[in-house]
């Protein structure tokens, strides 16, 4: 089955402020119903167009992975159009190299070599990476999407608007999407939201001198059912993520998420701070020069909790699949991955390393034709 589809096309007109385009709504419906992923170009601005021009349909598709373009210096291309969508959803999602000005992209045309630029040429590179992760490495589309977005998120606070580059620029090499540096622990969690609270409180993170010397990053992706006739209240299901150290039965969240603490929290703040009703959620602690280790509680366990909330019909979020990518960065640069794997195994986790060469060998052997004489 073909699970990854590239759409290098788009409208010259801007998206509307208060409702999703029919084309984008159809893409969102298809991705909710079927196990597929659309990669959509972020559309281009012409020289004659105004500054700050919004993206065009179908780049307002919430479930799709929307790609804008940057130049070779990771700066937004001069033809970039801007998000966000419905004044809230972060679009584009990511950026990649699409050529610009004198540094155009070299392609093969029917008449030979040609030099081009545009988001239509950036998107296929991301499509290739997504297809590689899903078809060759064997990851789910939720995890694949989360990995690609997570790889674009820097430990340093960005100085370019997310309306132009999304969560960041995806690395050129697929190894840098899957692999980590020696001072990082990266793991993926996937599953389905079977009830109101889907959780695990049994993540053993290595302790050093009764502290956790890490900063953390987590990226959540899922594909909710959407309702175009709801206007700005477009997504039907919210997965509210809580991730951090476990103190008794309570998670001390990395991003201080208080949505479940019975405190007064306006909807605008919940959306802005915790991305409520967004199908992509990123939690990140940026590197600080005076960063300190965190206190370790009890057995040094961390946990996560996903609370499922419905806007319209009970059941829209039932069996909704999700993918979470978690990265822990050691603040002193020490490699603690072996200790982490050992502790996970002792607690009953089945830890499978993602080895690119091994997965490719398995894929190639599975694709071989066998002749029975």
Listing of model-derived features with the role each one plays in the protein:
Residues 33-35, 61-64, 85-91, 136-147:
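Subtilisin-like serine protease catalytic core
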Residues 213-216, 285-315:
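Noncatalytic modules at the cell exterior or secretory-pathway interfaces
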Residues 1-57, 116-117, 121-122:
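Substrate-binding/access-modulating region of protease and related hydrolase catalytic domains
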Residues 11, 42-46, 70-72, 100, ...:
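Acidic, glycine-rich active-site loops and adjacent beta-strand->loop/helix elements
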Residues 213-253, 310-373:
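Exposed low-complexity, polar/acidic, P/S/T/G-rich flexible segments that act as propeptides
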Residues 53-131:
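Extracellular S/T/G-rich loop segment that most often corresponds to the catalytic His/Ser-adjacent loop
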Residues 137-215:
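C-terminal subdomain of the subtilisin-like protease fold in secreted/lumenal serine endopeptidases
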Residues 229-283:
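Surface-exposed beta-strand/loop patches in noncatalytic accessory domains
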């Amino acid at each position: 089955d073909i699970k990854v589809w590239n759409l290098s096309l788009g409208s010259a007109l801007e998206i509307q402020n208060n409702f999703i385009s029919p084309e984008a709504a159809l893409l969102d419906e298809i991705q909710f119903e079927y196990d597929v992923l659309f990669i959509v170009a972020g559309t281009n601005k012409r020289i004659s167009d105004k500054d700050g021009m919004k993206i065009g349909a179908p780049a307002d598709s919430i479930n799709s992975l929307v790609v804008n373009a940057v130049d070779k210096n990771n700066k937004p291309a001069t033809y970039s159009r801007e998000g966000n969508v419905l004044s809230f959803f972060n679009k584009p999602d990511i950026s990649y190299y699409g050529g610009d000005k004198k540094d155009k992209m070299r392609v093969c045309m029917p008449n030979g070599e040609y030099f081009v630029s545009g988001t239509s040429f950036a998107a296929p590179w991301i499509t290739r990476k997504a297809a590689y992760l899903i078809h060759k490495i064997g990851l789910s589309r939720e995890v694949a999407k989360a990995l690609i977005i997570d790889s674009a998120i820097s430990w340093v606070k960005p100085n370019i608007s997310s309306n132009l580059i999304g969560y960041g620029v995806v690395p050129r090499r697929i190894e840098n999407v899957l692999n980590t540096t020696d001072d990082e622990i990266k793991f993926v969690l996937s599953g389905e939201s079977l009830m109101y609270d889907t959780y695990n409180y049994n993540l053993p993170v290595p302790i050093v001198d009764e502290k956790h010397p890490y900063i953390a990053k987590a990226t959540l992706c899922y594909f909710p059912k959407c309702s175009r006739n709801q206007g700005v209240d477009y997504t039907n299901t919210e997965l509210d993520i809580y991730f951090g150290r476990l103190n008794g039965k309570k998670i001390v969240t990395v991003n201080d998420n208080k949505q479940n603490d019975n405190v007064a929290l306006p909807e605008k703040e919940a959306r802005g701070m915790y991305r409520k009703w967004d199908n992509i959620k990123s939690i990140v602690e940026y590197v600080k020069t005076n960063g300190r280790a965190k206190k370790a509680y009890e057995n040094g366990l961390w946990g996560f909790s996903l609370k499922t909330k419905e806007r319209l019909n009970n059941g829209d979020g039932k069996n909704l699949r999700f993918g979470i990518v978690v990265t822990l960065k050691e603040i002193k640069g020490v490699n603690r991955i072996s200790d982490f794997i050992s502790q996970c195994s002792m607690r009953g986790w089945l830890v499978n390393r993602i080895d690119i060469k091994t997965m490719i060998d398995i894929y190639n052997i599975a694709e071989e034709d066998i002749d029975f004489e």
